[in-house]
Amino acid sequence: MSFNVIPAIDLKGGKCVQLVQGVPGTEMVSIDDAVEVAAGWVGQGAKTLHIIDLDGAFSGSRKNAYIMEDIVSKFDVDVQVGGGIRDYETAKYLLSLGIDRVILGTAAIKNPDLVRQLADEFGSETVMVSLDSKQGEVVIEGWTESSGKTTNEMGKFFSEIGAGSILYTNVDVEGLLKGVNEDPVRSLVNSVTIPVIASGGVAKIDDLVKIKNTGAAGVVVGSALYKGLFTLREAIDKVS
């Protein structure tokens, strides 16, 4: 299984944006045509697109759904979507658009039965659980509240109840372009039996190599690509 370098597309108000540490109003990059952005990543060799619906995350609105549908219909790549997916109906709706995988964060932690239900009905491969980790503990509600559980405990639990993969975000380094901390990624990979995708802090191509060496299945890259620190093509060539 080759290591997957996954470009992030954050949607807000129909545009592709990049926020610093997820804070509204801190857009570093805003590009009007998100479908064109997707086309660029696919053109450089992306096999998967990581779409976060910030309007969904901040307000529960699904006004960006038409963009996701457009991306799914135009490109023959895997699409995973997160951002405010808090219930079965929303997840089912997104999967009905042809999205390959829904990413559940706070909702999974507060209601693990949602993970079981979606895995039973649509297959484990459609369910990715997002574990946002701050100093080794999983945080929820947009990083404002600690779950009181370690990342490894949570990872093991979700891998046992039906999640098909885990998205691990190190909140301590997310969006800051300061580099990755590979130790917690390796530790999580060794605690679970399902693929782990890492996210947060990638600033240079060497960071991708570090993540690959942990045994993770892939890495999500956002800020570094949008700031032009390296190209997606260079990244894929380096780790493939």
From Swiss-Prot:
Encoding gene (name): hisA
Xref: CDD domains: HisA
One GO CC annotation: cytoplasm
Listed NCBIfam families: 1-(5-phosphoribosyl)-5-[(5-phosphoribosylamino)methylideneamino]imidazole-4-carboxamide isomerase, PRK13585.1
A molecular function GO annotation: 1-(5-phosphoribosyl)-5-[(5-phosphoribosylamino)methylideneamino]imidazole-4-carboxamide isomerase activity
EC main group: isomerase
Species the sequence originates in: Methanocella arvoryzae (strain DSM 22066 / NBRC 105507 / MRE50)
UniProt-listed SUPFAM superfamilies: Ribulose-phoshate binding barrel (SSF51366)
Substrates-to-products reaction catalysed: 1-(5-phospho-beta-D-ribosyl)-5-[(5-phospho-beta-D-ribosylamino)methylideneamino]imidazole-4-carboxamide = 5-[(5-phospho-1-deoxy-D-ribulos-1-ylimino)methylamino]-1-(5-phospho-beta-D-ribosyl)imidazole-4-carboxamide
Taxonomic lineage from the root: Archaea, Methanobacteriati, Methanobacteriota, Stenosarchaea group, Methanomicrobia
Localization of this protein: Cytoplasm
Official protein name in the record: 1-(5-phosphoribosyl)-5-[(5-phosphoribosylamino)methylideneamino] imidazole-4-carboxamide isomerase
GO biological process, one term: L-tryptophan biosynthetic process
